[in-house]
Amino acid sequence: MFRPVLKVRPSFSYPYSIVSSRSVRLASTATANANTAAATSTVAAHGTQETPFDFEGHFESELAKKRLDKSYRYFNNINRLAKEFPLAHRQLEDDKVTVWCSNDYLALSKNPQVLDAMRKTIDKYGAGAGGTRNIAGHNIPTMRLEAELAALHKKEGALVFSSCYVANDAVISLLGQKVKDLVIFSDELNHASMIVGIKHANRPKHIFRHNDLAQLEEMLQMYPKSTPKLIAFESVYSMAGSVADINKICDLAEKYGALTFLDEVHAVGLYGPHGAGVAEHCDFEAHRVAGIATPPQGDNGRLRTVMDRVDMITGTLGKSFGTVGGYVAASSKLIDWVRSYAPGFIFTTTLPPAVMAGAAEAIRFQRSHLNLRQDQQRHTAYVKKGLHDLGIPVIPNPSHIVPVLIGNPDLAKQASDILMEKHRIYVQAINFPTVSRGTERLRITPTPGHTNDLSDILIAAVDDVFNELQLPRIRDWEMQGGLLGVGDKNFVPEPNLWTEEQLSFSNEDLNSNVFEPVIDQLEVSSGVKL
């Protein structure tokens, strides 16, 4: 039988002063223990007598509120098929639908070159990065991708994040935390990621009406030019398809001493001769001629292009580039600063090497394939015209987004459900809080793969749903005075961002330097050595 061995400590003689001080400490400890015991008994009494907080009941109550205000979300099981784009299957593989609302705008998620790059990388480097950028997660695919992104936007550096939500939150909040007295100016329709970043920045903020630059200027005038300022806005606003006047915002930023923060999430891949976004598209011809190089500066030494003038550009890898992740492109100093201070970048595992490699290949491919952007634009125009000719209310905009106005959350969901079940077409209903109440809509996003034949089927199906549900058409909105430009006789539509001349160019009209360019790794991706 096992018996524990008792070890007896040897007896020592201590000096009187040590014994006395130890006795005092023991007495104090005893008193403290008595007080603690009394407090503990009180706590114990609370623990046995009081009813604990009902967490499950609280969760149920909060969910009930979402259901009551029609903002509860139902997820559709959609499995997009790489070899049958734009088809997807639902739970059963023979239950196929045509997807009309994906943000895979150029269908690069199925591109053979992108997939091949990912396969080769996963075979060579494995499934995961193995750590954060600082600990075992910094690698060649990451550095190559950041170099590609910087080259795309013609900036000194770029930094990849796990998503653009994280990128927007991390950069904006860091600016607020580190730039004393910063004041932030934000468009009212900015994405949730920017709104959260502004909240985390914990700095004074001013929200200006959507694309109302007169009001923005009034707000900027409230502060001395020496006060640090940040103007946060998007190029293409994803739910309405409206577009910011980037050049004029840059004018205001220079006039009043502000940094510009531009979210190009729904524009990269789709605008500009090389897919860098609306900022590049503003100087389409200059960038087309220069190719991957920076267009020459003007005679007065001032930067010529709008893309040059924007201080920070954020974007996503998960839409036009067909993979996942987000990024910011900016000056080398700003990128190094974010790399060194932003918790959202520092304390998270690096994206898998295969994802980085696939995204880099997607950027290279789309840069030299102008036809992808042009086909997407042509298909969008075809759908918009077909719907408009039938009196179906499309919120007017100059971009690739096709928002079909419904104006009621229940009817928007019913319309989406009928399209799915009756017509085998998937178009997601967009309700509050993504859009304001009373402006609920269906959001359609054509791609290069949505041919005119598929578009005709979609247009007929939407028309059938409008008839079945007796949904308001353009003439009905006219009788109500119009909404969001639909049925508004005083509304002046903006011309499409793509001109007929731009749509007439071919891939061969691009500068030869965009085909298989050699892009060097950036020092700032690893850290700048002094």
Curated annotation (Swiss-Prot):
Q: Which SUPFAM superfamilies match?
A: PLP-dependent transferases
Which keywords belong to this entry?
A: Acyltransferase, Heme biosynthesis, Mitochondrion, Pyridoxal phosphate, Transferase, Transit peptide
Annotated GO biological processes are: positive regulation of organelle assembly; protoporphyrinogen IX biosynthetic process
Residues annotated for substrate binding in this entry: 73, 186, 205, 434
Q: What pathway does the UniProt record associate with this protein?
A: Porphyrin-containing compound metabolism; protoporphyrin-IX biosynthesis; 5-aminolevulinate from glycine: step 1/1
N6-(pyridoxal phosphate)lysine PTM positions: 319
CDD domains this protein is in?
KBL_like
UniProt-annotated location(s): Mitochondrion matrix
Which GO-annotated molecular functions does the record name? 5-aminolevulinate synthase activity; pyridoxal phosphate binding
Q: What's the top EC group for this one?
A: transferase
Per the UniProt record, one Pfam family is Aminotran_1_2
Q: Which residues form the active site?
A: 319
Using the UniProt entry, state which stretch of residues is the transit peptide: 1-26
| Chief location bin | mitochondrion
Which PROSITE patterns is this protein grouped with?
Answer: AA_TRANSFER_CLASS_2
Q: Which GO terms describe its cellular component?
A: mitochondrial matrix
Could you say which residues bind pyridoxal 5'-phosphate here?
238, 266, 316, 348-349
What cofactor is this protein dependent on?
Answer: pyridoxal 5'-phosphate
Known EC number(s)? 2.3.1.37
Reaction equations catalysed: succinyl-CoA + glycine + H(+) = 5-aminolevulinate + CO2 + CoA
| NCBIfam families for the chain | 5aminolev_synth
**What family, per the record?**
Belongs to the class-II pyridoxal-phosphate-dependent aminotransferase family.
Q: What does this protein do?
A: Catalyzes the synthesis of 5-aminolevulinate (ALA) from succinyl-CoA and glycine, the first and rate-limiting step in heme biosynthesis.
Q: PANTHER family under this entry?
A: 2-AMINO-3-KETOBUTYRATE COENZYME A LIGASE, MITOCHONDRIAL, CLASS II AMINOTRANSFERASE/8-AMINO-7-OXONONANOATE SYNTHASE
Indicate the quaternary assembly: Homodimer.
Protein name from the UniProt record: 5-aminolevulinate synthase, mitochondrial
Q: Which organism is it from?
A: Candida glabrata (strain ATCC 2001 / BCRC 20586 / JCM 3761 / NBRC 0622 / NRRL Y-65 / CBS 138)
The gene behind this protein is HEM1
